[in-house]
């Protein structure tokens, strides 16, 4: 079993997070017909998430390798001033994926949410709805894209 370490991202982690996002796009989103990654925009997004939200990283201690991340921030419903916690990205590298590691990341978000509703939009097409249902999320609809 892999020994993992969960921690908050720091400025020194930006390049590693960027590389993980590239892998996510190239491996899991390869068939999704998404546009190419713009390095400047993605780096800006990562920095913005570190300023206005949180980035939780997961590292394989045995291999000293970044294996997962979750980016999230407080937001509001578009129709209300009531706050929500919005998960922007939750990702674990393919070889490491299991329910326990996903639960660990989501539990970290729950602790930060302090009772706020947590909203997660899935746009990968990976068919992992049952995992999030098992974690207590309720399916409130679907993401649709016209290409």
Regions found by a protein language model. Give the residues of each.
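Conserved beta-strand in the GNAT
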Residues: 57, 64-74
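A short beta-loop-alpha structural element at the N-terminal edge
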Residues: 3-19
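A conserved beta-turn-beta hairpin within the catalytic core of GNAT-like acetyltransferases
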Residues: 76-87
């Amino acid at each position: 079993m892999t020994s993992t370490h969960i921690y908050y991202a720091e400025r020194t982690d930006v390049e590693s997070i960027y590389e993980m996002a590239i892998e996510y796009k190239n491996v899991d989103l390869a068939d999704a017909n998404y546009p190419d990654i713009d390095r400047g925009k993605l780096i800006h997004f990562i920095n913005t998430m570190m300023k206005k939200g949180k980035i939780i990283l997961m590292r394989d201690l045995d291999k000293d390798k970044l294996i997962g991340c979750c980016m999230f921030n407080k937001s509001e419903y578009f129709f209300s001033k009531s706050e929500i916690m919005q998960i922007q990205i939750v990702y674990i590298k393919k070889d490491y994926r299991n329910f326990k590691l996903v639960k660990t990341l989501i539990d970290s978000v729950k602790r930060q949410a302090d009772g706020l509703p947590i909203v997660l939009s899935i746009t990968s097409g990976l068919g992992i709805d049952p995992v999030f249902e098992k974690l207590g999320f309720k399916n409130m609809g679907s993401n649709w894209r016209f290409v």
